């Protein structure tokens, strides 16, 4: 059985507020899941809550915010609000796994 998954949110803050992203894409995924009558895991909603709760500074730990010299692949540093670091990937994957369990698609551990 197919399962659809919305994208995680991006870390875009303006005036201290986390901004909505992926609106039309998320809506299209929800409509497709309804039309196909398949489960949808709303990773966007859950990741938005996680990032918002971490705050503007704290949420940097989830995304590719690297200081110069922190990672040899990015000697000058990096500021990427779309792609996750290991901590973010693990936290968002945990949330997705919880969604799969709540939807009855996989058994609880």
PLM region spans:
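Conserved, well-ordered alpha-helix/loop/beta-strand core segments that scaffold catalytic motifs
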Residues: 2-5
